[in-house]
Swiss-Prot record:
Residues forming the catalytic site: K66
GO BP of this protein: amino acid biosynthetic process; aromatic amino acid family biosynthetic process; chorismate biosynthetic process; shikimate metabolic process
Protein's recorded name: Shikimate dehydrogenase (NADP(+))
InterPro entries xref list: Aminoacid_DH-like_N_sf (IPR046346), NAD(P)-bd_dom_sf (IPR036291), SDH_C (IPR041121), Shikimate_DH (IPR011342), Shikimate_DH-bd_N (IPR013708), Shikimate_DH_fam (IPR022893), Shikm_DH/Glu-tRNA_Rdtase (IPR006151)
Stored Pfam families: SDH_C (PF18317), Shikimate_DH (PF01488), Shikimate_dh_N (PF08501)
Organism listed in the record: Bacillus cereus (strain 03BB102)
SUPFAM superfamilies: Aminoacid dehydrogenase-like, N-terminal domain, NAD(P)-binding Rossmann-fold domains
Functional pathway: Metabolic intermediate biosynthesis; chorismate biosynthesis; chorismate from D-erythrose 4-phosphate and phosphoenolpyruvate: step 4/7
Length: 277
């Protein structure tokens, strides 16, 4: 019998997840299908109960349901609970269990371009919203010991740092201070929407004085190279856009559902083609 998977969100028509997962199922000769479900906020509970009753094997959760979904699950993974958001649900033995693969997916993506373990790196996170929280907690869970957080509102950065129970040396900074101290970091991670299409001329931090070998990663993938990535590339940095995070978080969800590891490079090239790259 064909296994059913999917993604719920609103809006959902733009999602690249169906094409990515369905190609992986086909490539691995699996009898499964991944479908995008438009689910409005006021019917989230009914939708989740319906998916469970239909016997869906697993599903992803995107905007605006990543927090609200937690009220309708049987179990929540400890890291997802700490992050306060779920983006992947596994249906097994009659139970719906929630996970967050955004942060772990990002960590795997980052490690894929780093020649050294991330645990030895000094990291600067730009932004203190939901994406930053998922990445901060996942880096801490992976054993990274030095993570500073820069945000327009410094108090929000302080709140993020205070919420983490892992042993991490962290300082909350203004964006101005982070700009001055950028040369002291091994990795800079941009987690805000600043620089996203159509406001491509904006950047949260002017890149001017990076040290050699710095990695600059931006979770945005429209455009492929944001202003911060263009400036970092000019400085000789190793750069990474948000496609890697998207692919790795999806691959991790696929692995959780099926027990099979999909071809990451195949997924990545497919997404790039679909985005017009």
């Amino acid at each position: 019998m064909k296994q059913l998977y999917g993604v719920i969100g609103n809006p959902i028509g733009h999602s690249l997840s169906p094409v990515m997962h369905n190609d992986a199922f086909e490539h691995l000769n699996m009898d499964a299908h991944y479908h995008a479900f438009l689910v409005k906020e006021e019917v989230l509970g009914e939708a989740v109960r319906g998916l469970k009753a239909l016997g869906i094997s697993g599903f992803n959760v995107t905007t605006p349901h990543k927090v609200a979904i937690m009220d309708y699950l049987d179990e929540i993974d400890p890291l997802a609970k700490q992050i306060g958001a779920v983006n992947t649900v596994v249906h097994k033995n009659g139970k719906l269990t929630g996970y967050n693969t955004d942060g772990i997916g990002f960590v795997r993506a980052l490690q894929s371009i780093s020649s050294e373990p991330l645990q030895e790196k000094r990291i600067l996170l730009l932004g203190a919203g939901g994406a930053s929280r998922a990445i901060y907690f996942s880096l801490a869970d992976a054993g990274v010991k030095e993570i500073d957080v820069a945000n327009r509102t410094v108090d929000k950065a302080k709140e993020l740092i205070a919420a983490c129970t892992a042993t991490v040396h962290s300082v909350a900074l203004s964006l101005e201070k982070a700009t001055k101290e950028q040369g002291s970091y091994d990795i800079i991670i941009q987690t805000t929407t600043i620089g996203m299409h159509p406001r491509v001329e904006h950047t949260p931090l002017q890149i001017s004085s990076l040290k050699k070998g710095t990695i600059v990663s931006d979770i945005i993938y429209n455009p492929f190279e944001t202003k911060i990535l263009c400036e970092a590339k000019e400085q000789g940095a190793i750069i990474q856009n948000g496609i890697d995070m998207f692919v790795y978080q999806g691959a991790l969800a696929f692995e959780m559902w099926t027990g099979c590891v999909p071809n990451i490079e195949r997924m990545k090239q497919l997404v790039i083609r679909k985005l017009g790259g």
